[in-house]
Amino acid sequence: MKILVIQQKMIGDVLTSTIICELLKKNIASCEIHYLINSGTEAVVQNNPFVDHIILFKPEFKENKFKFYQFLRSIRDYQFDIVIDVYRKVESKLITLFSGASKKISYKKLDSFLFYNWTIPYLKQDHNSDLAIQNRIQLLSPLVDQLPSSISSKIYLNDSEILEANLFLEKHQINKLSPIYMISVLGSSLNKTYPFDYMADTIKKIASIGKGQ
């Protein structure tokens, strides 16, 4: 069974949606997972054992309608059985439509019936866990009977990357036995970035409470 998961967005969204790939692999025997993401975001997906193939959506597909049409036709050649559209924008809707898959799943919107035959209401209220995680898990409800309430996404490193990271920590005298926090202070745009003074105070509080490095 071939399954296409579509998540065209920034690195954080691409990483988060790998939980869909993981849950599919763990619950559907012998499924083959193809993950369609924007080029430039693949670093957080490489080495992931739950992703069989990465399909890159290139900038030229946005800029050139003919190249986008060629890409759409190439999607049909994969003969996907199921498409899960996490992105739910015009491009991904067309990709879903051209896929020819018998099961097409996404969130419920006014025009969803034109592109999908399974639509899931988008949760607006937090139920004691990350809302972004919950909404992604809900997309699997037509396929998986028992779903977890929460799950964490992971980055999988190869041996050389692990060695490089260990050398970096040793060079900067960071104790690997103590908690290590990696915090990004910049969002993907200005309106998704906290004020620097506020972020500086937040980091200080995290460091003082958690005894992290």
Question: Predicted regions span which residues?
Answer:
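Catalytic machinery of carbohydrate-active enzymes
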Residues: 1-213
